[in-house]
């Protein structure tokens, strides 16, 4: 598990460097003209100003999951995603009981004042028991990810993500579910009414049923 005790080693492995005369570690992303920083003195995770953070509790050392979110954002920036297209802790009201849910990471395909198109939603967990429990729940009933998907029906992917630090290496798992109907399955549905599609599902429960019955609970990897 990534934690406060090994976090500096993780950062060093990821290419962060310690600023002279301080306990701040930093890494720049020239192609995106932004940087990530970690302030160990104040125990703060500092994200680019262009990136939207809805809940500042994700920016402290208080929860081990925050380190996973930070590592995942680093991976996204490394892959070239724009910081202004990333949001942390986006909140929705879920279900009839008006309970709220917060997605760890949302990445947009388009994000302007006129138009916002979600690309994918990521739920982050610490490696080991927490991740294994979340995956079990995901397979059994869809968990929170399917509720988020229902709120953002335009999203193309949802994923369950965990990262770890083992034997001096940063490792990760990323269980990805496509939210788009397969073209061949759509053709089958035209001939067979028993084949159900995501586009005809109206609730998180129905989305899960389609994933289970039509797509056999298929995961993708990146």
Task: Pin down the residues of each PLM region.
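Short secondary-structure junctions
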Residues: 76-85
């Amino acid at each position: 598990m990534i934690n406060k005790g090994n976090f500096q080693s993780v950062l060093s492995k990821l290419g962060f460097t310690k600023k002279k005369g301080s306990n701040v570690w930093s890494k720049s992303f020239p192609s995106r003209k932004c940087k990530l920083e970690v302030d160990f003195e104040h125990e703060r995770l500092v994200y680019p100003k262009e990136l939207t953070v809805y809940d500042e509790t994700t920016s402290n050392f208080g929860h081990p999951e925050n380190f996973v979110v930070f590592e995942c954002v680093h991976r996204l920036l490394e892959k070239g995603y724009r910081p202004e297209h990333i949001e942390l802790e986006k909140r929705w009201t879920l279900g009839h009981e008006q309970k709220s849910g917060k997605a760890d990471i949302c990445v947009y395909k388009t994000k302007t004042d006129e138009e916002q198109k979600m690309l994918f939603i990521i739920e982050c967990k610490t490696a080991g028991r927490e991740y294994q429990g979340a995956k079990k729940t995901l397979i059994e009933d869809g968990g929170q990810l399917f509720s988020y998907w229902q709120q953002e029906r335009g999203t193309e992917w949802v994923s369950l993500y965990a990262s770890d630090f083992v034997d001096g290496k940063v490792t990760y798992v990323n269980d990805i579910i496509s939210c788009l109907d397969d073209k061949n399955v759509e053709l089958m549905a035209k001939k067979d009414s028993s084949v159900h599609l995501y586009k005809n599902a109206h609730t998180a429960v129905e989305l899960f049923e389609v994933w289970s019955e039509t797509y056999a609970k298929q995961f993708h990897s990146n």
